[in-house]
Swiss-Prot record:
Subcellular localization: Host cytoplasm; Host nucleus
Function statement: Plays a role in viral genome replication by driving entry of quiescent cells into the cell cycle. Stimulation of progression from G1 to S phase allows the virus to efficiently use the cellular DNA replicating machinery to achieve viral genome replication. E7 protein has both transforming and trans-activating activities. Induces the disassembly of the E2F1 transcription factor from RB1, with subsequent transcriptional activation of E2F1-regulated S-phase genes. Interferes with host histone deacetylation mediated by HDAC1 and HDAC2, leading to transcription activation.
The protein's name in its UniProt record: Protein E7
Motif (LXCXE motif): 23-27
Quaternary structure, from the entry: Homodimer. Homooligomer. Interacts with host RB1; this interaction induces dissociation of RB1-E2F1 complex thereby disrupting RB1 activity. Interacts with host EP300; this interaction represses EP300 transcriptional activity. Interacts with protein E2; this interaction inhibits E7 oncogenic activity. Interacts with host TMEM173/STING; this interaction impairs the ability of TMEM173/STING to sense cytosolic DNA and promote the production of type I interferon (IFN-alpha and IFN-beta).
Cellular component per GO, a single term: host cell cytoplasm
Native source organism of the sequence: Human papillomavirus type 26
Post-translational modification: Highly phosphorylated.
Motif (Nuclear export signal) on chain: 83-91
GO MF, one annotated term: DNA binding
Free-text comment about domains: The E7 terminal domain is an intrinsically disordered domain, whose flexibility and conformational transitions confer target adaptability to the oncoprotein. It allows adaptation to a variety of protein targets and exposes the PEST degradation sequence that regulates its turnover in the cell.
Stored SUPFAM superfamilies: E7 C-terminal domain-like
Gene3D superfamilies tied to this protein: 3.30.160.330
Zinc finger (unnamed): 65-101
Amino acid sequence: MHGNIINIEDVILDLVPQPEIDLRCYEQLDYEQFDSSDEDETDNMRDQQARQAGQEVCYRIEAQCCMCNSIVQLAVQSSRQNVRVLEQMLMEDVSLVCHQCAAQ
């Protein structure tokens, strides 16, 4: 539009049909290169980097306080197998307590 007064002639509506776009993906994956385990992709990358460096990996763990249900965060450095053991313990008979409940 040009000027201070709005005219219908100033509004140009030219609708030009776009060529049809193919939105399908023709990518093919080689499923043999992927294993069917339940591990997260980021865990795999982190483990690969740690194995290459010959180090253990640092994991961040979040769980609820068993007394007040607030979030408790831990950072542990361990192997993947030992973190799985800790995860199993937290799901069964080990509970975490936040610092406020522990002080009472």
